[in-house]
Amino acid sequence: MTEKKNSREKKNPREAKVTFEGLVTEALPNGMFRVRLENDTIILGYISGKIRSSSIRILMGDRVKIEISRYDSSKGRIIYRLPHKDSKRTEDSKDTEDLKDTKDSKD
């Protein structure tokens, strides 16, 4: 009876995929991108459904996590956009702090 149970078990489909970090080098139509991986191979990446439905923008120069199938290593699914270290938001907040400091010094 245990033999039947073991034969019915399904493997996790995520086991057949490998995750890498990469850099978007080129934006192509229909949510496709050329991504340079850490090991300097360039593959074709497409946006996952969650990123598409969340309308997260992916641009050239963005760092992304990409999931690649072991069976076809020429394509991968972009599953996460990594945050920028030099993001625009942090620069904007520094500018507003500088403005506050200059206003305080004038008073």
From Swiss-Prot:
Tell me the protein's name. Answer: Translation initiation factor IF-1, chloroplastic
Which InterPro entries is this protein grouped with?
NA-bd_OB-fold, RNA-binding_domain_S1_IF1, S1_domain, TIF_IF1
The protein's GO terms of the molecular function aspect are:
ribosome binding; rRNA binding; translation initiation factor activity
In the UniProt record, the gene name given for this protein reads infA
Q: Chief subcellular site?
A: plastid
Q: Where is this region: Disordered?
A: 81-107
The S1-like domain, residue ranges: 8-83
- Give start-end positions of Basic and acidic residues composition bias: 83-107
